[in-house]
Amino acid sequence: MKLFNIILSAALIMGLVTSCGSGNSKKAKDDGFVSIFDGKTTTGWRGYNKPAFPAEGWEVVDGTLHCIESGTGEAGNGGDIIYDTKLSNFELDLEWKIGKGGNSGIFILAQEIPNEPIWKSAPEMQVLDNDNHPDAKLGKDGNRMAGSLYDLVPAKPQNAKPFGEWNHIHILCYQGTVVYSMNGANVVEYHLWTEDWKKMISDSKFKDFPNVLNPAKEGFIGLQDHGNDVWYKNIKLKILQ
């Protein structure tokens, strides 16, 4: 995916990178990334469609954000969470680890729609135990496997690590171009607000969700509570303008 390198190089050469203004972020490093999760508190995060961080269902443990297995299905306990700053052009870098048979997701440009789940509002990067969750065998050409644009574009190469192991993720969102990288390889690229995007969504189960068909220009980063154990750590952000 050569476009990723072209866009990123242009941003760096033109000096478009700025530091994130979040109050809980650590001082920017030389690479422009700042931490948006300090590994000790939930400062800067809150529940989706909620004013505060969930009182149960999520915990900070051993430097991670842990969604606790509930056995009650999607958003059955704490619910989805969001980083409480709207973003437009950025790079997101983090690590995730899934429990056996687990499912979760990472959202960008998410919107808060009352009484609706987060997945109806934004593109989702799939987080999954490919070996033990049935979703891995559904969809088309592996587009429900880890690292994929969920149910739309399969991650290729499919290089997710098994449950219990850490996966390193990088997401670039810049002027409508989105690139997912997993464990050092670019695995998905798509282009928002284009005719190709609109056709892909119109032919999918998301066709009736206007915020997916025509995503917002800015929105929240979200982490999904799908009722399964999942851990996130080393969550860092670089703002691109």
Question: Model-derived features: where do they sit?
Answer:
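Bacterial Sec-dependent N-terminal signal peptides
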Residues: 1-28
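Carbohydrate-interacting regions of secretory-pathway proteins
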Residues: 20-241
